[in-house]
A protein has these predicted regions:
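Membrane-interface transmembrane helices that cradle and orient dolichyl/undecaprenyl
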Residues: 3, 108-114, 150-166, 176, ...
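Short helix- or helix-capping micro-motifs
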Residues: 21-24, 120-125, 173, 177, ...
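Short acidic/glycine- and proline-prone juxtamembrane loop motifs at membrane-interface regions
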Residues: 38-39, 92, 129-143, 316
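Transmembrane-lumen/periplasm boundary regions of multi-pass, lipid-linked membrane glycan transferases
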Residues: 44, 49-50, 175, 186-293, ...
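Transmembrane-helix motifs of polytopic, lipid-linked glycan transferases
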Residues: 86, 90-111, 149, 153, ...
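Specific aromatic-rich, kink-prone transmembrane helix
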Residues: 102, 123, 142-159, 165-173, ...
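Membrane-proximal, lumen/periplasm-facing interface regions of secretory-pathway glyco-
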Residues: 351-400, 416-424, 500-504
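Aromatic/acidic, Gly/Pro-rich catalytic loop(s) in extracytoplasmic/lumenal soluble domains
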Residues: 433-513
């Protein structure tokens, strides 16, 4: 009887939830490798390949102060998939689906309303802010997933006062810390859930359980001490964080500029703009009934956002991705509004949000250059040296040359030493040991000596470099242009890149003659 009652109450929710899940997966999976490899993606995927090949280097990311969980997962199947970029990005696709399920769980746990939960899922599924990064081989999507589930089991721990819930919350927090350092916010925000405790004496039972969460999470994190360079995590964290002392001299810098980035540059475009109205509806709807739940949501969203905006040296959309799940739950809770006129306005802005989001997503799926990305995102992922346009094509050409010349070694010099090049080329040539890829530096005025020596030794020798990094006429260096690959045109004519390097970056592929 209980199962029949449960099915009757939940059958439409299960069906709708399943359809939303399938829809979210399909739109994330479609054309997954359309966007060229990004600098950090190339690094993470290359690390995974090296870690797979050499067991003694399983802690390789620590050399750059990065936690390795994403790479540990990727290394197990990186060689089983023909396209390494697809292998890396599919992890984020599944992480996004894990976040989606977690959003449903958290929203229902807080509001006990099926419509709020389904709407929260829909918003995550289509919002460009989440959709874009769920299709990138970056660690942020995975960290966001662990953050949602840490919050879910943290709330359950507070409500049930059960040790097993605290242990699971600790495991989720620990996985987050093994993914990326900002996961520390997941632990710092858990005491906010204590607002759900209705009897002060119950805190005596709850607080020790959160000590358990901390011990389990940091116990997992300390696994990293088994590898060399554990100290590099703290060292590299300092590169991204401003000292606390500066708040006394510059309290609004960079807080105000970063808030302008979020609310003036990012949200109107990638939100997209109806997000502002939905946030206001969510804040006002049924406040008296759900004020505790909404305090948890608002602090979980704004707390990390304010701290990152105040103390972050680097500040981009993906650095605040983990704050979006609770924000989307808040937006969905606007459906709880009672006033009919206000509810009609909520539905109007909801439909506008759905329409504008789907148009944005369509461009990302078919022609990312047409998507109305903020300048910082467009520049990094589409326009500048960090965008890997042409790299896969260069790799395919080199593979064909290897087949034509099986007895000859092929040496390829690329600009840089770390990042889009040479890592972006190495990930595609991992199974071609006769093709040697080496970084030769930046801003070249002459052919590097290592490439000249390779040519003298009888090897087929090539150079891959972005146009802005080649500071001399290629004809004077004896370079024969094989192919060139245009990146997306620079839209901001006032940017330093446009002024110094022209309207478009180009990847150049040369052979030494």
């Amino acid at each position: 009887m209980r199962m029949k009652k449960f099915f009757n109450e939940w059958k439409w929710v299960i069906l709708a939830g399943f359809l939303l899940l399938v829809f979210a997966f399909c739109i994330r999976f479609y054309n997954l490798t359309l966007l060229p490899v990004f600098a950090d993606e190339a690094i993470y995927i290359r690390w995974s390949q090296v870690m797979n090949a050499e067991p003694t280097l399983r802690f390789l990311p620590l050399s750059d102060g990065k936690q390795p969980l994403f790479m540990w997962i990727l290394m197990f199947f990186i060689n089983k998939v023909s396209n390494p970029l697809f292998a890396g990005r599919i992890i984020s696709v599944f992480s996004g689906i894990g976040t989606l399920i977690g959003i449903f769980a958290v929203s229902y746990l807080l509001f006990k309303n099926k419509l709020v939960s389904l709407l929260s899922v829909l918003i995550w599924a289509i919002c460009p802010l989440s959709f874009f990064f769920d299709r990138m081989a970056l660690v942020d999507s995975m960290m966001t997933m662990f953050g949602v589930w840490t919050l879910f089991f943290g709330i359950l721990t507070t409500k049930t006062k059960r040790l097993d819930m605290a242990l699971i919350a600790g495991f989720c927090f620990g996985c987050g810390m093994l993914t990326k350092s900002p996961a520390i916010f997941f632990l710092l925000l858990l005491p906010v859930t204590w607002i759900l405790v209705k009897k002060p004496k119950d805190l005596i039972k709850v607080i020790p359980l959160f000590v358990v969460v901390t011990v389990v999470g940091y116990g997992m994190y300390n696994i990293l001490r088994l590898g060399p360079n554990f100290n590099m995590i703290a060292s590299r964290n300092q590169d991204y964080v401003l000292p606390i002392s500066r708040i006394w001299t510059y309290p609004t810098d960079p807080l105000i500029p970063h808030f302008i980035d979020v609310f003036v540059k990012w949200f109107p475009k990638m939100g997209p703009w109806p997000i502002f109205a939905l946030i206001l509806f969510g804040l006002s709807a049924s406040w008296k009934k759900y004020w505790r739940e909404k305090v948890i949501i608002v602090i979980s969203w704004l707390g990390p956002l304010v701290i990152l905006a105040e103390f972050g040296r680097a500040f981009t959309v993906r650095y605040i991705l983990f704050t979006f799940p609770v924000l989307f739950i808040l937006m969905a809770s606007g459906i709880l509004v009672k006033n009919k006129i206000i509810k009609s306005l909520f539905y109007l802005f909801l439909f506008l949000f759905i329409g504008t989001s789907l148009v944005f997503d369509y461009h990302l799926l078919t022609n990312p250059a047409k998507a109305n990305l903020p300048r910082s995102e467009r520049s990094g992922y589409l326009e500048e040296w960090t965008a890997g346009d042409g790299i896969k094509e260069v790799a395919e050409y080199l593979k064909s040359e290897e087949l034509k010349n099986p007895n000859k070694k092929i040496v390829v010099g690329t600009e840089g030493f770390f990042g889009t090049l040479p890592d972006g080329l190495q990930i595609y040539l991992n199974r071609n040991p006769k093709i040697i890829v080496i970084g030769v530096g930046l801003n070249l005025n002459e052919v590097p000596e290592s490439l000249l020596e390779s040519k003298i030794a009888g090897n087929k020798t090539y150079l891959v470099i972005n146009k802005s990094r080649l500071k001399v006429d290629s004809d004077k260096l004896g370079l024969e242009l094989i192919a060139s690959y245009n990146k997306s045109p620079r839209k901001d004519i006032n940017s330093s890149e446009y002024i110094n390097n022209g309207p478009q970056e180009v990847l150049l592929f040369f052979e030494l003659k």
